[in-house]
Regions:
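TPR-adjacent "capping" and linker segments in tetratricopeptide-repeat scaffold/adaptor proteins
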Residues: 20-30, 337-343, 375, 437-441
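Alpha-helical segment of the N-proximal tetratricopeptide repeat
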Residues: 26-57, 111
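Helix-start (N-cap) detector for alpha-helical repeat units in TPR-like alpha-solenoids
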Residues: 28, 62-63, 96-97, 135-136, ...
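Structural signature of tandem alpha-helical TPR/SEL1-like repeats
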Residues: 41-50, 74-87, 110-126, 148-157, ...
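Terminal, low-structured helical/coil segments at or just beyond the last alpha-helical repeat
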Residues: 588, 595, 599-631
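Structural marker of alpha-solenoid helical repeat scaffolds
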Residues: 57, 91, 130, 163-164, ...
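Canonical tetratricopeptide repeat
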Residues: 67, 101, 140, 173, ...
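Residue-level recognition of tetratricopeptide repeat
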Residues: 36, 70, 104, 143, ...
Length: 631
């Protein structure tokens, strides 16, 4: 059809008129050619007038509407351009260029107006079907799929077109798609390739920094940040981020040095001062750190970050009530009703989490219920409190109600979908829950697969969790979260050797992953195997996060298993200071006292553990019974 219209438009050009001058075909042809000539000469207003006249004379001509759309887009009149491109595609559904232009206009607008994403996807999909080998269309469609939350479809669109491997736009979109769909092993290669294609590309550099941070490879991130700092010496946020990533990567002395230099140069840099405070705290200089954070709060009582940082530092030192008081003071400053409702909700959600950690469950639930779901979305910490209490109190209907509210507020969040399915199964609506988990497990996005595996683990269906995670690892090679879930599920099914192999594979990819070092080291220690190796792992985990109570407990436990009771007491006591309401730490302290023959002290710890909801209360009760003490 398009060829027919083109023929009519150019018919007889330069020859004697075939039709009378008033013939509409002649009028359209002359007006169209006048528009094209004016456009070529840069006379855009004249061209626009002629194109509009041509569209009036030939309202059913797709080429006229398309050319008008192209000019309007060039002139920045995007809304009218989109209308004309859509009209051209409507008149000729096989007009690939019209579909591509309509989709491109929607895609350009979608960054600021997400409501344009679906129409961008629809138009670009039609263009892609009409010209499946067009690399520009494939790259644009992939970008649209990314914006729609379907990175799996984005990658598929790129795979449809051979020869895109060296296309700069495709390299970028491929990296983003693999990252967002959770194909971490492939994404690592993609980001390396993107940056190698042009090391001076700032977008590639900053995107790579964010990617490596998300992978918790802070060493790589710091190297790239330093490269960026060399190019942008006056970029203070880059310097701040170097200090922060050194801290997050366990390089505490370097982080302190960087942060001190920043503070000396710019005392008003609050971010650098917070990082310095955190570096001091993690190196055991908590008094200096607290003093610094309190000074930040005194200087600006309305800074929520300083208040939350101080609160969690105090909580980590076993000072829960003091931590809660810091945040409550901040909330009180916002007034009632609060001057900043969403900020108040966020901080109160943190209070709910601290109350829960202190086992003040009723208070935690009350605040969590008031803050879990708001107009800005879900407060993860509050919702977590409500769901965990629903499990512990065996109130699955409550859990289902809250999970559905969260899923309604954030329909794209797979964790809430998994929670809905979990509580549907708990309430007896098994068919609905099973279907949701099956759909998540089959997803082309790793985060959804992980949500299904996590839900199965919460339901204590460890074999199913392991199977889902194993299938996911095959499809999303190098996804460390799925690998970790696979290892933990295998461990819970008693497959210790298989679990160990998975965790060791993670450590080959990320040798300083503190959580993996802790899990694997504790697993070996608890089973009484490979104790020297377990101790080295746990010492490394503690070196990476010295104030982590769970890591300290694990290190104390492996020392106990090796009969190094002095070191066991040292680390278990530190763990008890950090997490005084932890049942496992109290049980381990009881076992330590029993090994020493101090049965009265052992029973005190075991009884304390029983009040803290241990995973295996019957085992602890048996220890008390066997000791001869009164239950």
């Amino acid at each position: 059809m398009r060829a027919k219209w083109l023929l009519l438009l150019v018919l007889g050009a330069g020859a004697a008129p075939v039709f009378a001058a008033e013939d509409p075909v002649i009028a359209v042809r002359e007006t169209f050619l006048s528009a094209k000539m004016a456009e070529a000469e840069g006379k855009f207003e004249q061209a626009l007038g002629d194109f509009r006249k041509a569209a009036t004379l030939a309202p059913d001509d797709p080429v006229v509407h398309f050319e008008l759309a192209v000019l309007l887009q060039q002139m920045g009149v995007d809304d009218e351009a989109r209308k004309e491109a859509g009209r051209a595609a409507e008149l000729d559904p096989s007009f690939e260029s019209a579909w591509r232009l309509a989709g491109a206009i929607d895609l350009a607008a979608a960054d600021k107006d997400p409501s344009r994403v679906p129409s961008a996807v629809a138009a670009l999909e039609k263009a892609h079907r009409l010209a499946p080998q067009n690399p520009g269309t494939a790259a644009a469609l992939a970008r649209a799929h990314l914006l729609s939350g379907r990175p799996d479809l984005a990658r598929a669109a790129l795979d449809d077109v051979p020869g895109l491997a060296d296309n700069p736009a495709a390299i970028k979109v491929r990296a983003q798609a693999d990252d967002k769909r959770g194909a971490d092993g492939q994404a690592r290669q993609d980001y390396d390739r993107w940056l190698a294609s042009d090391p001076t590309d700032r977008d590639a550099l900053t995107s790579s920094i964010e990617f490596w941070e998300s992978q918790r490879d802070f060493g790589r991130a710091v190297d790239l940040l330093r490269q960026l700092r060399r190019a942008e010496a006056d970029n203070t946020p880059v310097a701040d981020r170097i200090a922060l990533d050194l801290l997050r990567g366990g390089r505490f002395a370097e982080a302190e040095k960087e942060a001190r230099a920043l503070v000396a140069a710019r005392p008003e840099d609050r971010g650098a001062r917070r990082t310095l405070a955190a570096a001091l705290d993690i190196q055991g200089r908590s008094e200096e750190s607290v003093e610094m954070l309190r000074k930040l709060i005194d200087e600006d009582p309305d800074d929520p970050t300083a208040a939350v940082t101080l609160a969690y530092q105090l909580s980590g030192d076993g000072k829960g009530p003091e931590a809660i008081a810091v945040l409550q003071k901040f909330v009180d400053r916002l007034g009632a009703p609060p001057s900043k409702p969403e900020l108040s909700r966020e901080v109160r959600s943190e209070i709910a989490g601290l109350l829960y950690g202190d086992r003040r469950f009723d208070e935690a639930k009350k605040i969590a219920a008031e803050t879990a779901v708001g107009k800005d979305g879900v407060a993860d910490r509050s919702l977590g409190v409500l769901l965990e209490r629903a499990r512990d109190e065996n109130r699955p209907a409550d859990g289902l109600a809250w999970a559905k509210k969260a899923a309604d507020a954030e329909p794209g969040n797979p964790d809430w979908k998994g929670a809905v399915a979990e509580f549907e199964i708990r309430t007896g609506a098994r068919a609905e829950g099973e279907k949701t988990l099956a759909d998540l497990a089959r997803s082309g996005i790793a985060g959804e697969v992980l949500a299904a595996a996590d839900a199965r683990e919460r339901l204590k269906d460890f074999a199913a969790s392991a199977q889902i995670a194993a299938d996911g690892v095959k499809r999303f090679e190098g996804n460390l979260d799925l690998m970790f879930r696979l290892g933990s599920a295998l461990e819970r099914t008693g497959k210790i050797d298989e679990a160990g192999a998975v965790f060791e594979e993670i450590l080959k990819i990320r040798p300083d992953d503190a959580n993996t070092l802790n899990y694997l080291g504790y697993m070996y220690a608890d089973k009484g195997i490979r104790l020297a190796e377990a101790r080295r792992m746990l010492e490394r985990a503690v070196a990476l996060d010295p104030q982590n109570g769970a890591f300290l407990d694990s290190l104390g436990w492996v020392c106990f298993r090796m009969n190094d009771l002095r070191e066991a007491e040292k680390f278990l006591s530190k763990a008890a200071q950090k997490i005084p309401a932890d049942a496992t730490v109290q049980e381990h302290l009881g076992d330590l006292e029993a090994r020493r023959g101090q049965m009265a002290e052992a029973v005190v710890h075991w009884k304390r553990s029983l009040t803290l909801s241990p995973d295996e209360p019957e085992k602890i009760a048996k220890k008390i019974h066997d000791s001869g003490a009164t239950p």
